[in-house]
Amino acid sequence: MSHCPKLYFISFADSRMSAATDRIREQARDMDVFDEIHVLNEDSLDDAFCQTWKEIMKYGSRGYGYWCWKPYVILRLMEKMPDNAVLLYCDAGCHLNPKGKKRLMDYVESVMSSSIGVKAFYTFFKQYDVIERRWTKGDVFDYFKCRDRKDITDSKQIATTQIFLRKCPSSMRFLREWNNIWYENFSLIDDSPSKSPNFPDFVENRHDQSIFSIMYKLYDIQPLPSGETDVADYSNMDEFPIWDVRDRGYKDTRFVARVKRWLKARKILLRIRYLRIKERIEKFLVKK
């Protein structure tokens, strides 16, 4: 990369996760690449925003209000950044690894060369495939008029756990479109039942991530390499800068997080197997 852009870092979690936000702030400093580091909590949000979402933005709610704050805090900072500056958003549960600085700069170079100025990773779990149609409600596919596009429905979902953005007109348009969904059609975000049919193997909606993922594919953006943030095997992660640990700062976090991930994966696998068996039975009955 001939010229290193100005680099920004941002993360957010409510104040119950102060241990996680303190940790990721220090890790961002230890990376020694960011010109500005912004680690926020609910006190960082504007009064008008809090008033708008006060009914859902409560402690214990999913994503502290279905992650309504995520596109908002990213967009708010991007609007203040100079053109062509690069922002890395990470969930506060991530860990940053200074040994992976070289690979981090590869990601920066990738978003610098992107015509859209947005880069993210596929969602990656070794236990099961995170295929879009299983993790996005039917209404979202119909809203974006892509229900019949197998390149979207049958491909892996794009994660919003880590996002690289370069400030340019196309990335700002992307962010505003993503953010506006909360205001224009909140039922696409939440856990309310889909009005239109879900796919037969649907498991659950992934809220902000479902919207982001569909948009990412419609914008025809190439994802970053899959599996470079997964921490199933720490021994192979030294060269990678961002670890998807889900370390929320609670006591015995690493062990508890692993147990929770295992239990959730098992529940999801059982749900997927049930749907597959149901589909086979229905096909058999139709043939008879």
Question: Could you tell me what each predicted segment is?
Answer:
Residues 1-288:
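Glycosyltransferase catalytic domains, chiefly GT-A lineage
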